Swiss-Prot record:
SUPFAM superfamilies per record: C-terminal UvrC-binding domain of UvrB (SSF46600), GIY-YIG endonuclease (SSF82771), RuvA domain 2-like (SSF47781)
The UniProt record lists the keyword Signal: no
One Pfam family recorded for the sequence: UvrC_RNaseH
Domain of life: Bacteria
GO biological process, one term: nucleotide-excision repair
GO-annotated molecular function: DNA binding; excinuclease ABC activity
Family to which the UniProt record says this protein belongs: Belongs to the UvrC family.
Domain GIY-YIG intervals: 16-94
Free-text function comment from the UniProt entry: The UvrABC repair system catalyzes the recognition and processing of DNA lesions. UvrC both incises the 5' and 3' sides of the lesion. The N-terminal half is responsible for the 3' incision and the C-terminal half is responsible for the 5' incision.
Name of the featured protein: UvrABC system protein C
Origin species: Bordetella parapertussis (strain 12822 / ATCC BAA-587 / NCTC 13253)
Occurrences of domain UVR (ranges): 203-238
GO cellular component: cytoplasm; excinuclease repair complex
Amino acid sequence: MPDDFNLKSFLADLPHLPGVYRHLDAAGEVMYVGKARDLKKRVSSYFQKNLASPRIAQMVAKVASVDVTVTRSEAEALLLENNLIKSLRPRYNILFRDDKSYPYLLITGHAWPRIAYYRGATSKRGQYFGPYPNSWAVRETIQILQKVFRLRTCEDTVFANRSRPCLLHQIGRCSAPCVGVIEAGDYAHDVQRAVRFLNGEAREVMDEIEARMLQASTELRFEEAAVLRDQMGSLSKVLHQQTMENVGGDDTDVIAVASAGGKICVNLAMVRGGRHLGDKPFFPTHAEGEQPAQVLEAFVAQHYADGAMPPVLVCSHALPDSGLVGLLAEQGGTRAARVLTRPQGVRRSWLEQAQKNAEMALARALTESGARAGRTLALAEALDLDTDEESLDALRIECFDISHTAGEATQASCVVFLHHDMQPSLYRRYNIVGITPGDDYAAMRQVLTRRFGKVADGEAPMPGLVLIDGGKGQVEVARQVFVELGLDIQSLVGVAKGEGRKVGLETLVFADGRPPVALGKESAALMLIAQVRDEAHRFAITGMRARRAKTRNVSRLEEIEGIGARRRQRLLARFGGLSGVSSASIEDLASVEGISQELAVRIYDALHG
């Protein structure tokens, strides 16, 4: 520790109050963030002789100072801790990927509700069901609701402008409320039954449909009875195919932890309304040497900090901090979940299955990790880079690519490879402006100057390898930029396409004068380079297309004779965007105010020509 940091005096002055502490190294970088019910006791515990975790012992040896923040409560400390972990990503905290928000199934608040896949803040009017572990689980549930209850999935703009039933009605997946095939009351009943099904009342819904079918048959309403019979048949198939269990109606998350080969997997399974919706594996970083219970606690703290916790958590290990779930509930303004570590009955089988899935996901990850690390090693050996384990893990590769269509909407992409894998959160796109359309050299000069100008100013990290998608010309442009910025040109490598642009025939071109190298199509190093190069190309293409579409969307309609700003606005408002206008029939187009039959034909031909 530095001489100006008096540890003994610092610890003596700490209060017996809740708060957050941060361990900093000699460079002032935050290495670890934690919360405490009692700051004095918790921070002092790090400086005892015997620490259970080798990782934490290694961190403590590097501590140069400690910052503390006193909070009004332990719940407030938990919130601050999670915010700091997310923003700082300290290298000694167990970290879970801050994933996209989970998807939900939404039944809208429209007079004729639609069912929809939804991801984002749950602020729209309607009923939300979930969260689901993945998009596939939501879409499967939507298909079930279409089969059984025949609820609509079309956008409101399409619903409001249909003149005849769509294909979904013809195949029995929609009751066509858009054109009045079903009465409002009957459709509302179908929606209510769908809600009850999603809430775990599938058996009760089945009994109700059967009773209504028998009544309709008795009253000689055979057509209605046939519809109800088909509903019952579809629901019966679902009940046989799905695992539907009656466990008190409480939604449940099942969390299992598996460890092997120095890696840990946390597997989260979700049960909603008695239906097992599937599971999702998580692989934390900085968890080497940690006990499964500690990793489980970190997962619970980070995963439920921003999201709703279900009434029941079934866990493979007991949480070291028994008060954590209560703090999360207090923070979110909800009731604390029941935590079960020795479940019985069906919950026990859920946990056993989650544990098996965690172990299988971990085995797959270890196999893939070994293969990825092997490719990184092969590349390092081919390019004469450091090959020790730490250097390979820290090897950062950035690849740049330029994309445009005949000079329009030129965009550069930068993708990043780090820790033996692509890192999408570090990808960047650059809009290229002020150059002659189609001048790829000028575009490359601009993006490299913008990106590595920050490196020269000490504001961004310098990668160990910079890949340029191109041959001698592009590499020479990159070399000039690096020389102007005072950067080492040895890290610059161009990937020149082979004869016929065939994969495996690429040649590596070096900026420092080394002779070109052809690694061969069987080379693991070339496989890695091709993966990074192709990802840069994909990322650039998607960005360019989005930018081009954005600039074209407005102009495509206004280019049609007879369409001005006012008519364009009416069309976009009626059909919800250009794609809706493109999907509309001539009759639908002609129903818009100010659009004649002749103009509707002209619009249709222009968008479909």
